Amino acid sequence: MATIGMLYICTGKYTVFWPEFYETFSRNFLPGCKKEYFIFTDAPSIAHEDDPAVHRIDQLAYDWPLSTMKRFAIFLTQEKALEQLDYLFFFNANLTCREVITPEEFLPRPQQGEQLLLVQQPGFWNKKPMFYSYDRNPRCTAYI
């Protein structure tokens, strides 16, 4: 059984989304897999924090765009724990999982040579690659 890490930033007004996120993902996302929720929050308490799979981590709320720019630095505060997981996902706070998503249809299948899982943001659907927001500055380390 794979162990899935769920990264979730739950600061400021976004705390309102956490209960439904937890309930729908616990029920529908990768049934049969062990899920560990890493909740970065400034709230004094959150729903479901008594669940041993919910790891509440104190986190200062940042205004946008700083919250996005510092996201990976925030996650790396838990690097040791995250290294123990088989798969790691970050989800936007307002996402819900309305239908069952099985490991067979979602996770890579190593026996078939699959090693990575990629998800495309809906904003890129039906766009020509020249309109993707990739960094095209050859001096940038994020250059594509």
Regions found by a protein language model. Give the residues of each.
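Short beta-strand-to-loop acidic/aromatic patch adjacent to the donor-nucleotide binding site
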Residues: 84-94
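Short His-Asn-centered micro-motif
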Residues: 8-10, 39-42, 91-93, 99, ...
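N-terminal anchoring/stem segment of glycosyltransferases
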Residues: 1-67, 80-84
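Active-site regions of enzymes building and remodeling cell-envelope glycoconjugates
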Residues: 49-62, 74, 105-109, 113-115
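Catalytic core and acceptor-binding pocket of nucleotide-sugar-dependent glycosyltransferases
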Residues: 141-144
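Conserved donor-nucleotide/metal-binding helix-loop-beta segment in metal-dependent transferases, i.e.
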Residues: 96-137
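Generic beta-sheet signal
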Residues: 4, 86-88, 117
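Glycine-rich, basic loop-to-helix element that forms the pyrophosphate-binding segment
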Residues: 67-75
